[in-house]
Amino acid sequence: MKKILLTAALLCACVGASAQYKYEFTDVKVNAATPVKNQASTGTCWCFATVSFLESELLRMGKGEYDLSEMFVVRNNYIRRMNDNYLRRGRGNVSQGSIAHMVTWVMDNVGLMPEEVYDG
């Protein structure tokens, strides 16, 4: 038993005594990105993620930095879903959440709005 404890103590001492070096990251490619936005406690992650992707793509393509309104997209998506629910006589989906391509549907059919104009 003493041999096991002594061996364990020596192993722990050896591990602690090994040279510690600090790894430094190097930037291989730096991609521009828009600031992080807070969706609070809304079920709109689908919209925030997709709009963030579109903003990042605009930056990547050299089109400039945009801050697009996520809540404008959400509002128009819910209006469409309410109309759908009415046409289905109450059997449509009007709960939180949606899918990413609804952002492109709103973009194609209604358009997009800057955050400073429509902050929701």
Predicted regions: what is each one?
Residues M1-Y21:
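Bacterial Sec-dependent N-terminal signal peptides
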Residues Q20-G120:
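Catalytic-core signature of thiol
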